[in-house]
């Protein structure tokens, strides 16, 4: 049985034992700007990431796919229609073709923002001294991108940001591959409420603990005091996604969730008293 990796505890800067946190004896909740703050700025844009950093988010959260010529690109969907003025699959376009596109805002209006490369986004976080939640996605056919894990690691190493990054995935094969390539890297297994409807949180936490995974990202509707207690007992930190309702944010902060992942980092910042 593999022990839970301790690589990420310093990264999170969190105490999972009650009594070692703030004045109320609760762990400190960290703030992650989901897609840079998707309800405030064009999602997964350099503008969003720079603004999230300026706002004081602890983490910028984003998603990656591969271009046709093997560049790691920061974009949520495997296809281009929803968030850009382009069409088709990300994997069918070269980096030059993707960079020629423009991102849309949440109202669907085309902006001047381009699709960033992972290299560009890491540079923003590195220069600002911020941490990253990096989700590796599947392609439009629900297949893994060959070699994407190695490419992500190479870019993190180039910028010396591996120690400031949590690599996340819904697909177990992806986070397992990251663990194989870099056992000391902080990785996070993601679960939706629907996924947990086919199993139990306790069973999944035991699987993660045995695999040495120190973080779990849960859809916020399944995160309560019981779930947090189970995770802490397993030595696993919890991030809750994607929390945009102020009452839900407050509930999770009071419960002591490790990371609050939100499209509205401005609202979360106010509730955290920063």
Where are these regions (language model features)?
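N-terminal secretory signal peptides that target proteins for export/translocation
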Residues: 1-2
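Phosphate-group recognition and catalysis centered on beta-loop-alpha active-site segments
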Residues: 5-9, 15-274
């Amino acid at each position: 049985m593999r022990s839970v990796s301790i690589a990420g505890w310093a990264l999170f800067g969190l105490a999972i034992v009650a009594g070692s946190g703030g004045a109320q004896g609760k762990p400190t909740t960290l703030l992650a700007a989901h897609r840079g703050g998707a309800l405030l700025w064009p999602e997964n844009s350099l503008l969003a990431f720079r603004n999230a950093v300026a706002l004081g988010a602890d983490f910028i959260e984003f998603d990656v796919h591969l271009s046709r010529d093997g560049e790691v690109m920061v974009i949520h969907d495997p296809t281009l229609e929803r968030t850009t003025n382009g069409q088709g699959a990300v994997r069918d376009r070269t980096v030059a073709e993707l960079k020629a596109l423009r991102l849309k805002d949440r109202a669907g209006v085309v902006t001047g923002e381009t699709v960033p490369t992972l290299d560009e986004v890491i540079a923003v976080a590195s220069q600002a001294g911020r941490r990253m939640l990096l989700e590796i996605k599947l392609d439009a056919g629900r297949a893994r991108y060959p070699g994407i894990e190695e490419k992500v690691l190479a870019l993190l190493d180039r910028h010396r940001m591996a120690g400031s990054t949590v690599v996340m995935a819904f697909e177990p094969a992806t986070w397992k591959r990251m663990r194989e390539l870099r056992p000391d890297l902080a990785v996070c297994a993601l679960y939706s409420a629907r996924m947990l409807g086919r199993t139990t949180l306790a069973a999944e936490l035991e699987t993660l603990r045995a695999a040495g995974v120190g973080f779990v990202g849960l859809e916020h509707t399944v995160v309560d005091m019981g779930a947090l207690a189970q995770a802490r007992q397993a030595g696993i930190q919890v991030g809750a996604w994607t929390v945009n309702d102020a009452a839900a944010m407050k509930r999770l902060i009071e419960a002591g969730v490790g990371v609050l992942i939100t499209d509205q980092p401005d609202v979360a910042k106010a509730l955290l008293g920063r």
